Design a protein with these regions (language model features):
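Charge-dense, helix-prone N-terminal extensions
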Residues: 1-114
Length: 114
């Protein structure tokens, strides 16, 4: 089981990223806190971390073929808030994807966002 802080650290340990919070409004009633991990070189979004209804999510960019393959895995869906052809969202603590698979997808997302 990962916490938000552990997931942020995992992403930073395995991808050249920095965290930003561009979608969070201080005067909003929005309860979802978005942690956007941007590639250090390109400043493009590499990963997004958020929680909704006590579920921790990680959004990553993959090739379209890899997206089609991974959405067959429990706990992985097309990212509703991104281009669904290229992005997936993983329910981190409720997926059948292994840590190694998630790290592989993170590496792919980092490569695609350079």
């Amino acid at each position: 089981m990962y916490t938000r802080e552990q997931l942020i650290a995992l992403v930073q340990d395995h991808a050249a990223t920095h965290e930003t919070y561009p979608f969070n409004k201080t005067n909003s009633h929005e309860t979802i806190i978005w942690t956007v991990m941007k590639h250090n070189a390109s400043n493009k979004i590499t990963a997004m971390i958020f929680e909704r209804e006590a579920v921790l999510y990680l959004t990553l960019k993959l090739t379209p073929d890899h997206v089609d393959e991974m959405i067959k895995t429990r706990g992985i869906v097309r990212a509703y808030h991104m281009n669904k052809r290229h992005w997936i969202t993983i329910a981190v603590n409720a997926t059948d994807a292994t840590k190694q698979e998630m790290l592989g997808m993170l590496a792919e997302s980092e490569r695609l966002t350079k």
